[in-house]
C-alpha cells in the first residue's frame, strides 16, 4: 500500500489517514471517562487499560451548546495535562497532551483499536433537543464533530443522547457532578434524532471520501421499553454502524426495592404492580426489538451492556419474593448507601468489590434464572447488584446465540484490574484470540526548508506552512494534532558527500548512509512547530559550504521522541 507503514512498528501519526477494513467477529466496546485521571478514580490513566482486549474505545464526554458548537467538559484533562506517564516528553498544551493524546498513543501500541468521541451522556444531553430541531444546527453540529475527529485522527463518533423525548430537570448533586444539564425533551425528538444521525453520517462519509477511510457512527440507547418506543429503530439502524443498548442501571437506589441492575433475563418473581422496573433485562430489551421490528433491523449491529460496577441498597428487609434468591425483590431504603462519588447510589467499581464485601458483610449470590450476580447481607440488610465473570460469560453466549453485535461496558476505571474486560473478551472470542492489526496511510504537514550558507556550514529554517483556522476552543485544540510538526528529524543529502556536525540549536547530528542526520528534538522549541511557526538551527560541514551542494532535505516526524519515525517527506527543494 503506497505510503503505508505497519503500526506493529509502533509508529503513528494522526494527521489524515486511511485504515483498511479488517473483519472482527464481534465488538468489545469500552468507555473511558476523561475524569478517570483524577484521584476520585484512583488516577486510572489510559495506559492502564488492557487495550488488547477491546475493539472500540469511547472517550467520554464531549459537550455542545444549543447552536451545535463543541464544548469541552475539561480542557485541562482533554488537551493539556502532561503528567500522565505515557505522555513523557510532551510539553504542556502541545499536540498529544491530555487524555485525547494518551488515547491516541494507546492506539499506536494496539493497532487494531478504534477510538472515538462520545457526545452527551447523562449530564451533558441538555442541548440535544435544540440542536436536533433544525437543519441549520444539525448540520453545524455534524460538521463540527466530524471535523473534530478528523483533526484528531479518531475513527468514530458516538452519540449518547440521554434520552430523546425524555424530560429531566438538572440535578448536579444527585448526579455527583458540578454541571448537569438535564434533558428538556420534546415529542419531536423522535424524528429529529434520526435526522441528526443522518446529518452526522453524511459528514462522516464526506470526510471518508477525502481520506480514503470509513468512519463509524454509533449510538448509546436506553433499554427501557418506554424510551425504546421513542426511537425509529428501523430507520436509525440503517444509518448507524452499531447501537449500544445500555442494559445497565435498569434498577437502582432510586427504587424502594432490590433488583438486578444489569440482568440478562427477567426473573418473574417480582411484584408487577409495585416493581415496574424489575421487568427490565437484556433479554426483555432484545425481545422488544424482535417483537416490534422483526427482521426490519440488523441485529448484528446491536451491542448489549455490561456493568463492572454496583448499585446498592441498605435497610433491606427479609421480605424478598424469590425463595431461591434471598434478598431479591425485597423492601429497601432508597438512596441509603454513600458512594465514593458523593452520591447515595451505592455505586462502587468492580475492583472495589472485595473491600465492599468486607465492609458490608456481603456474601456472593447468583440468580440462575436472571443469570445475574448479586451480593447480600441478610443480617445487616445490604444488597448490591453487579456483573461478574459468570454473568458476563452468559451475556457473551447470548450475543452469539442471538446473532448480536457484541458487548459494551461502562467504564474502564471501574474495572481497574481488567477482570470484567477479560471476561468480556473471553466470552466473545475465546482465550488466545488476537485482533488483526490494520494499516495506516499518512498525509503530510505542509512544510518547507530555507537554507543559507555561512562560513562554516548552513543556517537552516524549517517552516510549517499550515494555517490555524479554528476559533472554537475544542476545534482549535484538536486542529494542532493535525497541523503541527512533531519531534522532527532531518536527513540532509549533499552532492559532495560532505560530513555534517552539530551547530547552534541543531541537537544531535550524525552521518548515516550518505546523509547528515539532524535530530533537534532535545531542544524545547523543536518538539512542536505549530502552524505558521518555524525552527532555525545551524549545522557545520567539513568542506566549503555552498547552497548548490545541498541536494535534498527529507523530514520525518514522531509522536513521541521515543517512538519510531513516520512519513518521510522531501521539504527541500519543493
Q: What residues fall within each predicted segment?
A:
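Short, solvent-exposed loop/turn segments enriched in Ser/Thr/Gly
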Residues: 452-459, 535
Amino acid at each position: 500500500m503506497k505510503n503505508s507503514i505497519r503500526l506493529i512498528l509502533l509508529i503513528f501519526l494522526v494527521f489524515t489517514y486511511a485504515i483498511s477494513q479488517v473483519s472482527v467477529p464481534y465488538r468489545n466496546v469500552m468507555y473511558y471517562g476523561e475524569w478517570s485521571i483524577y484521584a476520585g478514580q484512583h488516577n486510572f490513566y489510559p495506559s492502564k487499560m488492557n487495550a488488547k482486549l477491546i475493539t472500540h474505545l469511547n472517550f467520554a464526554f464531549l459537550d455542545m451548546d444549543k447552536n451545535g458548537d463543541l464544548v469541552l467538559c475539561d480542557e485541562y484533562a482533554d488537551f493539556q495535562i502532561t503528567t500522565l506517564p505515557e505522555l513523557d516528553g510532551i510539553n504542556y498544551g502541545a499536540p498529544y497532551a491530555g487524555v485525547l493524546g494518551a488515547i491516541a498513543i494507546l492506539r499506536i501500541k494496539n493497532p487494531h483499536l478504534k477510538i472515538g468521541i462520545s457526545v452527551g451522556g447523562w449530564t451533558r444531553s441538555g442541548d440535544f433537543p435544540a440542536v436536533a430541531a433544525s437543519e441549520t444546527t444539525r448540520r453545524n453540529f455534524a460538521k463540527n464533530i466530524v471535523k473534530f475527529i478528523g483533526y484528531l485522527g479518531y475513527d468514530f463518533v458516538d452519540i449518547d443522547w440521554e434520552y430523546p423525548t425524555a424530560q429531566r430537570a438538572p440535578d448536579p448533586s444527585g448526579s455527583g457532578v458540578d454541571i448537569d444539564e438535564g434533558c428538556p425533551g420534546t415529542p419531536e425528538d423522535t424524528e429529529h434524532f434520526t435526522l441528526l444521525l443522518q446529518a452526522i453520517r453524511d459528514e462522516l462519509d464526506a470526510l471518508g471520501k477525502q481520506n480514503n477511510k470509513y468512519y463509524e457512527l454509533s449510538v448509546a440507547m436506553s433499554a427501557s421499553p418506554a424510551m425504546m418506543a421513542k426511537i425509529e429503530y428501523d430507520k436509525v439502524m440503517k444509518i448507524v454502524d452499531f447501537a449500544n443498548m445500555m442494559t445497565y442501571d435498569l434498577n437502582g437506589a432510586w427504587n424502594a426495592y432490590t433488583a438486578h441492575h444489569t440482568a440478562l433475563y427477567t426473573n418473574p418473581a417480582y411484584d408487577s404492580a409495585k416493581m415496574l422496573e424489575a421487568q427490565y433485562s437484556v433479554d426483555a430489551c432484545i425481545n422488544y426489538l424482535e417483537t416490534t421490528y422483526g427482521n426490519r433491523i440488523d441485529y448484528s449491529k446491536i451491542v448489549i451492556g455490561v456493568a463492572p460496577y454496583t448499585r446498592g441498597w441498605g435497610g433491606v428487609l427479609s421480605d424478598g419474593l424469590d425463595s431461591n434468591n434471598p434478598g431479591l425483590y425485597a423492601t429497601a431504603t432508597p438512596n441509603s448507601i454513600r458512594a465514593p462519588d458523593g452520591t447515595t447510589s451505592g455505586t462502587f467499581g468492580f475492583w472495589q468489590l472485595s473491600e465492599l464485601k468486607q465492609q458490608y458483610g456481603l456474601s456472593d449470590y447468583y440468580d440462575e434464572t436472571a443469570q445475574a450476580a448479586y451480593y447480600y447481607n441478610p443480617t445487616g440488610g445490604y444488597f448490591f447488584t453487579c456483573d461478574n465473570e459468570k454473568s458476563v460469560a452468559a451475556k457473551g453466549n447470548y450475543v452469539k446465540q442471538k446473532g448480536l453485535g457484541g458487548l459494551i461496558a461502562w467504564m474502564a476505571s471501574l474495572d481497574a484490574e481488567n477482570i470484567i474486560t477479560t471476561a468480556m473478551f473471553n466470552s466473545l472470542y475465546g482465550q488466545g484470540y488476537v485482533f488483526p492489526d490494520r494499516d495506516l496511510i499518512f498525509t503530510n504537514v505542509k512544510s518547507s526548508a530555507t537554507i543559507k550558507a555561512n562560513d562554516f556550514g548552513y543556517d537552516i529554517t524549517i517552516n510549517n506552512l499550515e494555517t490555524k483556522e479554528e476559533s472554537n476552543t475544542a476545534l482549535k485544540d484538536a486542529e494542532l494534532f493535525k497541523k503541527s510538526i512533531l519531534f522532527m528529524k532531518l536527513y540532509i543529502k549533499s552532492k559532495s558527500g560532505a560530513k555534517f556536525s552539530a551547530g547552534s540549536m541543531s541537537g544531535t547530528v550524525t552521518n548515516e548512509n550518505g546523509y547528515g542526520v539532524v535530530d533537534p528534538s532535545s531542544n524545547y522549541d523543536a518538539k512542536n512547530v505549530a502552524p505558521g511557526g518555524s525552527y532555525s538551527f545551524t549545522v557545520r560541514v567539513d568542506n566549503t559550504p555552498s547552497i548548490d551542494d545541498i541536494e535534498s532535505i527529507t523530514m520525518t516526524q514522531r509522536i513521541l521522541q521515543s517512538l519510531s519515525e513516520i512519513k518521510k517527506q522531501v521539504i527541500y527543494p519543493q
